[in-house]
C-alpha cells in the first residue's frame, strides 16, 4: 500500500514538473473566452496518438478566492466516440501559467464536448486532421 502511494506521488510530482517546465515556453493560441476566463491551447503539444492530447491554459480574468490566477491542463480526446476528458492539471498563482503551483487538478472522466463551448473548441483542435 505504501509503495503504491509512493509511486502515485512520484508520478504526480513528475507530471507537475513536466507540465510546468514544458509549458513555460509554450506558444499559446487563444481559442475562447467567457466572462471569467481566457482559454489558450499550445498546438505544438498536440500529439497524433489514437487518443490525441493537448496542453491548455486557463487564465482567470480576476484571481480566484484562493489567489490562483491561471491553470495548466492536459486534455485528451476520443475522436471516434466524440468524447473529451481533462487528464490532469495544476493551479498557479500568477497569470499565463507562471508562479507557484498551488494545487493539483484530477481527471473528471469522459464528457460530451458539446456540454461546454470551450470543450467543443478543444475537441475540434484535437480531432481535426493537420
Identify what each model region corresponds to:
Residues 1-11:
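Bacterial N-terminal signal peptides that target proteins for export
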Residues 9-21:
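Bacterial N-terminal signal peptides
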Residues 22-130:
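N-terminal secretory-pathway/extracellular module detecting exported/lumenal segments
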Amino acid at each position: 500500500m505504501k509503495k503504491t502511494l509512493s509511486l502515485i506521488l512520484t508520478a504526480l510530482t513528475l507530471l507537475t514538473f513536466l507540465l510546468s517546465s514544458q509549458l513555460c515556453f509554450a506558444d499559446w493560441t487563444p481559442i475562447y473566452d467567457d466572462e471569467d476566463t481566457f482559454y489558450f491551447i499550445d498546438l505544438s503539444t498536440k500529439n497524433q496518438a489514437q487518443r490525441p492530447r493537448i496542453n491548455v491554459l486557463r487564465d482567470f480574468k480576476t484571481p480566484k478566492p484562493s489567489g490562483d490566477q491561471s491553470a495548466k491542463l492536459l486534455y485528451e480526446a476520443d475522436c471516434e466516440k466524440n468524447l473529451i476528458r481533462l487528464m490532469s492539471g495544476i493551479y498557479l498563482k500568477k497569470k499565463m501559467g507562471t508562479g507557484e503551483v498551488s494545487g493539483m487538478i484530477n481527471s473528471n472522466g469522459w464528457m460530451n464536448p458539446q456540454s461546454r463551448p470551450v470543450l467543443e473548441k478543444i475537441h475540434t483542435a484535437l480531432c481535426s486532421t493537420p
